[in-house]
UniProtKB/Swiss-Prot annotation:
It holds the Pfam family AA_kinase. This is Acetylglutamate kinase. It is found in: Cytoplasm. One of its GO terms (biological process) is arginine biosynthetic process via ornithine. SUPFAM superfamilies: Carbamate kinase-like (SSF53633). It comes from Verminephrobacter eiseniae (strain EF01-2). Pathway: Amino-acid biosynthesis; L-arginine biosynthesis; N(2)-acetyl-L-ornithine from L-glutamate: step 2/4. Belongs to the acetylglutamate kinase family. ArgB subfamily.
Amino acid sequence: MTDPLSIAPRDQAEILARALPYIRRFHGKTMVIKYGGNAMTDPALQADFAEDVVLLKLVGMNPVVVHGGGPQIETALNRLGKKGVFIQGMRVTDAETMEVVEWVLAGQVQQDIVGLINQAGGKAVGLTGRDGAMIRAQKLKMVDSKDSSIEHDIGQVGDIVSIDPSVVKALQDDAFIPVISPIGFGENNESYNINADVVASKLATVLQAQKLVLLTNTPGVLDKKGNLLTDLTAREIDALFADGTISGGMLPKIAGALDAAKAGVHAVHIIDGRVPHAMLLEILTDQAFGTMIRSH
């Protein structure tokens, strides 16, 4: 993080003045942030992220954090002698893996994020989809992306049936910052592991968020030559799916982002979480950053 004392006072004032139009525009608006990738594992980036979230809250916005935890889950599974298996970007989740996922996400990762935000001066509260009966889910039916006659059984991976945002809204009204682990529950009280990008996208839609911001380990969406695609429409995304440019873990991320854009979320951005204070650059400046997803 840049030491504010190293910046000349006039430059500090200029930075704050330039942010004012964005603070005014987004005051009272909800920002759903998917927190994942290197930003979750690098201590300096962790601190930057927490400070960014607290700043957004202090200037009158309503940040809601949905977090991943893939690397942490993988580490825990390796300690148990299990190897993670992925199909079309989704983790195959048997009963034992589901126990690990719940423990790592809700018991470790979520609490670390809550602690960092609170340490930075915010008031964060950790939730899973079980809290307040927020995220109801059912077993995901995964059809093969190349052969629709094939259906993959990936265990306790959930497809969202509904989201009740009342607990999130209640926390926002009391000046708390919700931090949500992507775990849902089924009709028989079984747990489901749900892709965090999908949860963030659906939650942004239900909350009628002003922005959905997805932090990644890349500058945004890249073409096959590695060039950044700064603006994508639904038609362009379909073409990138078809030719294999978008694959693996980016599949659910982009699909969820597009669904949110189609459902009326005002702005959907995929940005590089490896950049210090990436969120502030996206929300409080006019700097072109990452990839913007549009429905048309």
